């Protein structure tokens, strides 16, 4: 389902949402919860949600968070996962898209932070730079991105280095403002604060 969904996105010209993205999000969601003090069970649920969060793309990019949540529920039910755990996972998946979702609990918060901060050049699937849309340009311009945890101040900071010949810092902030506000809310749910630093400039 993950690879079929990514093939759909590639055909439509969207950025990569393959197993590589799924694994990265699962790992980072687990790391976020571990550092912010969640228990082992919540960390495991976040890993599952992170890995499965984009399977709805195999149906349609539009509303993929909700269709993905429904698919995930069916899969986890077949595996006899307790209903409370199923609901935690599908709620996180159903709320990971910035158009319709928000962080509601630690698992959904970790998923949002891990997903929305996965910005990197090799997520661009369009081979022709001249045909890049604005999202392609932003991802292609990302020379490096990382999350830094300032535990004493309880700050989760995204550090981003951009090639400003492709995309300026303000271009990035303008395009991804909705996502960054979503990350801020997610950090607040965890009892932390979210900061974005791009090319050495604090943006939020």
Walk through the language-model features, giving the residues of each.
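Electropositive phosphate-/nucleotide-binding environments in soluble metabolic enzymes
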Residues: 19, 23, 177
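Aromatic/hydrophobic pocket-lining residues that form π-stacking "cages" and hydrophobic walls in ligand
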Residues: 29, 110, 183
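N-terminal low-complexity or amphipathic/hydrophobic leaders
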Residues: 8, 24, 28-32
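Class I (Rossmann-like) S-adenosyl-L-methionine-dependent methyltransferase catalytic domain
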Residues: 14-17
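Divalent metal-dependent catalytic cores for phosphoryl transfer on phosphate-bearing substrates
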Residues: 10-11, 21, 35-149
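Short alpha-helical hairpin
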Residues: 1-7
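Terminal helices and disordered tails flanking the catalytic cores of nucleotide-processing hydrolases
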Residues: 118-204
């Amino acid at each position: 389902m993950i690879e079929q969904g990514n093939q759909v996105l590639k055909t439509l010209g969207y950025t990569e949402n393959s197993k590589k993205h799924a694994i990265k999000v699962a790992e980072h969601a687990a790391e976020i919860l571990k550092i912010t003090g969640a228990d082992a069970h919540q960390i495991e649920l976040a890993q599952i949600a992170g890995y499965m969060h984009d399977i709805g793309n195999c149906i349609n990019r539009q509303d993929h968070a909700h269709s993905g949540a429904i698919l995930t529920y069916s899969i986890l039910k077949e595996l006899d996962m307790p209903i409370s755990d199923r609901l935690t996972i599908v709620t996180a998946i159903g709320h990971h898209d910035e158009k319709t979702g928000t962080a509601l609990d630690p698992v959904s918060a970790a998923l949002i932070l891990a997903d929305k901060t996965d910005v990197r050049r090799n997520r661009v699937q369009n081979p022709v730079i001249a045909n890049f849309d604005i999202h392609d340009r932003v991802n292609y311009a990302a020379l490096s991105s990382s999350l830094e945890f300032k535990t004493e101040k309880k700050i989760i900071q995204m550090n981003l280095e951009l090639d400003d010949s492709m995309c300026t810092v303000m271009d990035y902030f303008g395009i991804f403002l909705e996502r960054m506000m979503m990350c801020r809310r997610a950090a607040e749910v965890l009892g932390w604060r979210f900061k974005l630093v791009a090319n050495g400039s604090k943006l939020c």
